Structure formats: C-alpha cells, structure tokens
Amino acid sequence: MTHAYFFKFGYIGYMFTGYQRGNGVKSVEDTIIKALNLNSPSLIKTAARTDRGVSALSNVFYIETERRPQDIAGIINSKNEYVFVHSFAEVEHGRNPRYCDTKTYMYMLPGETECDSLMVTASGFLGFHDFSKFSKKDTRNPWRSIDEVKCHRESFGVVLEFSAKSFLWNQVRRMLAFILEFRGNKIDPFSVSNIYSHIAPPENLILKDIVYKDLSFKPLNNGLKRQRLMMEKSLISYIVLKNVLG
C-alpha cells in the first residue's frame, strides 16, 4: 500500500552544485532522487529551493512510497554524508509541502558584531511589504510579510533569524547585506530608490526549520540527533574559517 509522507532533512549546501534537480552535476534534489532510484523525478516535491551554497537543518520533501519511513531515511543517509533525513509525518496524498505556516532562516555572523545594532536596522523589515527591491525578479507577487526577527549570541558570533510564511529568491541574503551595511541606523529599507543589488554570501545562510501547525513530525532515529549536531558543528566551523581566511 502506498503512503504519502513529508520528510524533514538537512544538507550542507556548499557541497552541492545547487538545490534544484538538473542544476549542475550534483544538486541536492538529484542526490535524493538517485539514492532512492526513482524512475520519475516528479515523485519528489520540495518545500524550499534554497540558493546554491545555502544549507538546511530542516527542509521538507514530499514522497509517495510503499517503503517504511525508516527505510527511506536509511537509504538516503547511507548514500551521502552531506544529506541527512531526520523526521517524518504522514500526510494526505497530493499535499504540497510549499504551503507551510512558517519558514525560518538563520544567518551566522562570526566576530564581535552586536545584536543590538543589527536589530535596530533589521526591525525595519518587519511587517507586510513589497520586497521587489530586495529580491531577484521573477513572476511571483513581491509582497511578503516578515513575521519575526531575532538575534542571539553564540560562542562564534551572532545568529540573526528571520521567520515568514514564504520568501522570495535572494530575499534573505539581500536583507542581510542591507542590515550589515547600515547596522545601527534606524532607517526605512523600503525608502531606497533603486533595487538593492548587494547580496550576502550564501554559505552563512541556513534554512533552520519549516512549520506546519497541523503536523507533528516524528524523529526517525536517536543516532540522527548526533548526526545533526555534527552537521551544525561542521557548518559553524566552515563559516568561521571562511570569514577568518577570506
């Protein structure tokens, strides 16, 4: 009997040629499709197509399968050390993972930057705005709502988080570039006359989580918690080293 599932999974983005299938020799989607030996790539649907170089702790993909969730996770996790599936939820057939309640991205900033100065500028993005000046142009409606911005300090530096129902292409990275350029200044980011073309590096950006209020995801394996922690440490080490060496 075929069941439909959402799987939460993470990946180290800089180890791939991009996210979307067909994007170079080794994309994240192509890696999953190849691992599961799927005859039809359309059997996989994804919640977020992250920019090249962006990592994730909890993206979501949808699949219909006769296999057990444990088997799906085991196959993917055993075939690539840079992708890990860590939890699942059974859903109705045909459900689109893109329609979520909240997506949260976090951006890691090594060094002595203070949260207070970042938040002064970042707070200008809160609320419902036209983000066409802070995204790469496509056919989608550019109006988006930033529901929450948070900042906290870690041992390596600070982490800035953005939560919204959806984001546009390059939106978070352009917002970050603006915040870093004008940090400490309380200005209206939407008062800029032209498209803001600066963009923050992708390697520091991580898709932290995707929330569906009606779903409760079940962890697949205690060992995967350890694997997730190892991936977090690997990302932090890479980001810190990259910022030190340039």
Swiss-Prot record:
Keywords: Isomerase, tRNA processing. It comes from the Archaea. InterPro entries: PsdUridine_synth_cat_dom_sf (IPR020103), PsdUridine_synth_TruA (IPR001406), PsdUridine_synth_TruA_a/b_dom (IPR020097), PsdUridine_synth_TruA_C (IPR020095). Disulfide bonds: none annotated. Its EC number is 5.4.99.12. It holds the Pfam family PseudoU_synth_1. It is an enzyme of class 5 (isomerase). One of its GO terms (biological process) is tRNA pseudouridine synthesis. One of its GO terms (molecular function) is RNA binding. Transmembrane segments: none annotated. It catalyses: uridine(38/39/40) in tRNA = pseudouridine(38/39/40) in tRNA. Substrate binds at Y105. The active site is at D51. Formation of pseudouridine at positions 38, 39 and 40 in the anticodon stem and loop of transfer RNAs. Belongs to the tRNA pseudouridine synthase TruA family. This is tRNA pseudouridine synthase A. The lineage of its organism: Archaea, Methanobacteriati, Thermoplasmatota, Thermoplasmata, Thermoplasmatales.
